[in-house]
Structure formats: C-alpha cells, structure tokens
C-alpha cells in the first residue's frame, strides 16, 4: 500500500466529502496529502514542493486555471476532477494532465497520480 510513499499531493476540492475521500484514498497509498478548498488555499499550497496535484476545476472562490497554470510552469503533474462532460480545453491547455469524472474510482485516481494507466 505504499505506491505513493514519499510523494506530496495537493488535493484542491471544495466539496468536503469528496475532498476527504480523495485525500483518504491517496494517504492510504502512502502519499502526504495537502488539502485546499479554495483558490486562495490552492495558491498557498502551491508554494511547497509538490509531486502531483488533484484539482477540482471550479473552487468556491473561482476557477482553478490560475493555479493550474502556475503548477504547469513548475512542472507539477496534474489530474483534474470534474463533473463536466466536455473537457477538451483542459487537455489542450495542459497536455500532460489527466481528467477524471467525479466521483473518481480509487484505482483510476491512483493510476493518474502514479502516472500510469488503470
């Protein structure tokens, strides 16, 4: 269960239950999880060294794209969580990013954060 041991993962999600579920799943596989429920919090969290970021597209105080742009410039791999069905723009803008539909199945989330395929 140490598939993510030593990795620090940001989970930016404003739905408390979903944030808790994602954080718990990643922590169960050994990740150190940093959480944020707002754009302001996600920006603050992006100041530390991150190995991956799991980002809700729409946070309580705004769109996550400014944080995603910053993380992209820093070379941090990202996985977007969304309930939207049309996400072509995300994969065009952030070519290396993965997109998962909410709620993400644990094995798909793990594969995305590890960088592999489920």
Give the positions of each predicted feature.
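Acidic, metal-coordinating helix/loop segments flanking the phosphotransfer/catalytic sites
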Residues: 35-52
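Non-catalytic signal-transmission and effector/linker regions of two-component phosphorelay proteins
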Residues: 1-10, 40, 91, 98-118
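Two-component/phosphorelay signaling modules centered on CheY-like receiver
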Residues: 16-34
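Conserved acidic carboxylate
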Residues: 13
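Acidic catalytic/metal-coordinating carboxylates
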Residues: 61-66
């Amino acid at each position: 269960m140490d598939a993510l041991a030593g990795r620090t993962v940001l989970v930016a999600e404003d739905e408390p239950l979903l944030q808790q579920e994602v954080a718990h799943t990643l922590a169960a596989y050994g990740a150190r999880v940093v959480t944020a429920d707002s754009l302001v919090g996600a920006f603050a969290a992006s100041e530390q060294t991150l190995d991956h970021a799991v980002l809700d597209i729409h946070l309580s105080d705004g769109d996550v794209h400014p944080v995603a742009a910053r993380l992209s410039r820093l070379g941090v791999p990202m996985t977007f969580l969304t309930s939207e069905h049309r996400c072509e723009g995300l994969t065009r803008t952030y070519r290396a990013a993965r997109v998962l539909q909410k709620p993400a199945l644990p094995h798909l989330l793990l594969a995305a954060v590890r960088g592999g395929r489920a």
